[in-house]
Amino acid sequence: MHPALSILLPTRGRPDRAEQFLRSVAEMSADPANIEIILYVDKDDPASHAIDCEAIPVIRIIGPSLTMGGLNTACYRRSTGDIIVPLNDDMIIRTPDWDRKIRDVHDRFPDGIYLAYPNDLHAGETFPSTPILSRTTCQRLISPYPEVYAGGFIDYHLMDIFKRLQVLGENRVVYLKDLVIEHMHPQYGKAETDATYRRRGPLDVGDDVFIGLRGYRQKAAQRLASAIKDQPSPDLPDLGKAPLLPDNDFLAVGHFLNVFLADGAIPLHWRAHLFEVLTRRHFLKKYKYPEPAWQYKLLKALAPLLKWPFQFIQKFK
């Protein structure tokens, strides 16, 4: 029997879009009999309680509103598949036999340690908006989707673990350029902003949590390396508390330089990418919303000059 896929699908306030996504799963799958969908809907979202898919079994969880990490964790705990695929209700699968392509990756790694991700037609190879893991990897990580992540950064969290694993001598990241799962997000001009997007805000949260879990991710990478070598795995530390990030611009940039560019446990291109992303988010949060300030307008004008060194560094992988 083929390895079974479990799709984790938290959704809120978008029954039509969720069912559009489910139709794309049914239409594009080579082996729908070996796919299950774990659907999480909030108690106070009755319009979504009846979301279903005739072609593929749907395991429905109706519960309280949770963090994004909590939603994915709840779905993962109910899943039974060999391959775990966290997806969003604002995505559409575009590639026929997409599940076969994922199973082919799964079969390449007898020890089950890998992170695969498709092309979302936006981020490309830069980071995994859909981080696909084996159940074996999830079990080694213990908490693959930490509940402390309220909104974003779970994708960065997992990618960072595997970048650290790469420095430890094991490159287990697989980018599936020809497998397209399109992200239909307003940010990319592919959808209208709805109540669910407005609830999360123009910039997701999680910067502080991501930075605070740096040491945790290093231990997680060491656990995966130990699993590959069939050696005893180190224990994971407590998640701890998210640090308070500097508000002062100079202190913030200095902090990100120290945290990311000076971190020899991750590849140089990934250090540059994280520094650029977190620094940009600092200035966007502070100066773009709710109304663009002069500092934002100045930085926007200087952006091409500021970005090119990091884009250059990121080419060296």
What kind of region is each of these model predictions?
Residues 20-34:
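Short, acidic, metal-binding catalytic loop of nucleotide-sugar glycosyltransferases
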Residues 81-92:
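Short beta-strand-to-loop acidic/aromatic patch adjacent to the donor-nucleotide binding site
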Residues 91-130, 167, 171:
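Conserved donor NDP-sugar-binding/catalytic core segment of glycosyltransferases
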